[in-house]
Each structure stands twice: as structure tokens, then as C-alpha cells.
Amino acid sequence: MTITQAEKQALIDQANTARQRAYVPYSKYRVGAALRTKSGKTFTGVNVENAAYPDTMCAERVAIFKAVSEGEQEFDTIAVVTDNGGSPCGGCRQVLSEFGLDTVVLIANGAGQLLQELTVKELLPEAFTPEKLGK
């Protein structure tokens, strides 16, 4: 599925809107994600912090888990928006790789400006994928 510039911007805008709902009482670092499936559905996510820091959940994974819980497992594009255009953490990169190395990742800042566009494979070279399990 090809994504147009207008569709990219729409995903960035959805992620930016979602970002305002992030629960970040500790870091104040709001992250929003908008994930488009190959069937054309979109799922958003925000980061949710916890006083027990390791139990914090990233926006990207929230969007992925929402999609999977609704029966979607094939992804086309994910937009990630932070104030300064931060990229997905290692854990999110690994979870994204589970569902396809060709997923496009759009990284944008809080002004809605696209800063980077790359694939999961480019974000996580030599990813540990299900194929590595020999199944």
C-alpha cells in the first residue's frame, strides 16, 4: 500500500493530537503514535508512565497492542510524534519488527513537521525476528 504525502501528514496529525492525552507526570515527555494497518484502519497510542518506571508503556506499543487486540497484524505505516522528534526506543523497534521490517516509520516533532522517514529494518538492522527462531 502506497502512502501519499497527505496521508503521511494525516497520520502525523493524529499522532500529535493523541500525544496531548499522554499520561506523563514524571518525565513530561509526551509521545503520540498513529499506526495505519494494511487494511487502512488507524490506531493511536500515547505513552503512559508509572511510578514504577519499568512499567511505563510507550506510545508505539500501545498503538500496536490496540491494533492486535482488534485483529490487525499487518501494518503499513506508523507516525511517532514528540516535542523534539525523538525516535522509537529499542523495545518499540523490536515489537515493530515482529510485524514486519517494511513498515514505514514517520518521525515528527510537536509542530507536525516530518523529520525522518525510514523503515523498521533501517531502524533495527539485524532484528531478531520470528524467522530467527527456526519456526
Segments and roles (model prediction):
Residues 23-26:
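Short Gly/Pro-enriched turn/cap motifs at secondary-structure boundaries
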